[in-house]
Amino acid sequence: MPRTDKKENTMTHRHAPARRLTKPAAVALSVAALILPGCSTAPPAAPIAAVAAEQRNPQALETLTQSVYVYAFPLMMTDALQRSALARVPAGRFLHQRSLDDDALPPAVRARADTLASSAFLDLRDGPIVLSVPDLGRRHVWVSLYDAWTDIFDTLGSRTTGARAQQVAITPPGWTGALPAGVRAVAAPTSLVWVVARVQVSGPRDEAAARRLQDRFRLTPLEDFGRPQARDAREIAPPGADIALDAARQRVTALDANAYFTRFAALLKDNPPHPADSTMLENVRALGITPGMPFDSTRHAEAGAQAIEQGAMAARHSLAVAVRQPPVTQNGWFIPRNIGAYGLDYEQRAIVGWDGAGTDLPQDALIARTSTDADGMPLDSTHRYVLHFDRDQLPPQNAGWALAAVGTTRRTPAPAGRRDLLSEADHPRPNRDGSLDLYLQRDPPPKGRRTNWLPVPTGPFIVRMTLTWPKEAALDRSWLPPAVLRQEQEQEQEQEQE
């Protein structure tokens, strides 16, 4: 369990799924009795794996396959992402995002507009690895530890464990042993662990100081702890991360059912499911999957083998469709909250895993995004916009807010001399009544408004707001970002005359 003796570290699940699988995969999951925590108090229904797979009719076998495929997908993606990362940096070494425009890491990892991220995959099969976190000073930093299923099992840093330097031994499942003095143990649920550290920055001028802090993070095998170690700093020249993510996903989705479930079975050996997954594990066993053993659909009759392949294809298709579905919005903003710790929501976990996971707990960073104005029209640089916060509706957070505008296809550079980021660190000027207006437009506003200006890229764009260490009002939805207002022609003319 995450440590809670220093500061707030709640991991409450707030389920508000914005995208759901289409039938038939959704039917498979509902039949599998995937009761979502907080959404129902009814006891789980009987698992669909009540009889062995070879005794099923083809339709039931296809349904069973879809359920298990979706359940396995995040573990398969973590494995594929690790293999992609190992082509660029050794296991147990950090891959650093060195600037706000650097795309050396997957999109979900670098989605925060005001942080530099460092990513490392750990293989704990040979024993614990010590993570050395430096003194953070006044800078806000957090380190998320993900298991192989993409759930965050611990968070270190400013919000949870404080700013002091610390040494943490990340131990594999079932490990028992002694640790050096001053080293605290964090038990990992799986042997494959993903570490993502985020260092908050106030803009490009602050990047050099943030990079120096990144260079002070260390990962050391326990057996080597205390010995001299080479400097762990690797600068990666963009682009590449999106390609690596796409390649990882394609590697997984290109597998036929036999190859997919054989790899899944191999990963299960060192990356055990969560204790709460007992119902789903009955489905896994009923399909004929045994940890560490090859999967062979041909042991079924021809119709059964075809049903398994069709079930895998249907699950892939349903995941791809679910990712593309328009999200449910409020005031035009999509705010995912049930991420980072998924409980029994295997569907949501798989949908997030499609884009590479790497998301934070909402308690660390709440990210809202919008691509439309208050009238539902797409945001476009041919217009000017205002984001207005009433005095009592300013973004509720403990460690800052940031606003970014990005192109609809990839990060687009801001106009010359400006950055595509506006944050609380810029000290935007409030109105006389205490309210705040932020100007989203391509061309600079009058001089008196430029401290409140977020430059936008040419063409259609998306606005992304990050609340770091959000307050409860943001987490429980009693606060929502206001809709983006398009300035009328008269207002634009008034601005030009100022």
Where are these regions (language model features)?
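Intrinsic low-complexity/disordered segments
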Residues: 10-12, 490-494
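A compositional/structural signature for long, glycine/proline-rich flexible linkers
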Residues: 40-490, 497-498
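C-terminal motif of bacterial Sec signal peptides marking the signal peptidase cleavage site
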Residues: 36-38
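Short, Lys/Arg-enriched N-terminal segments with co-localized hydrophobic residues
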Residues: 1-10
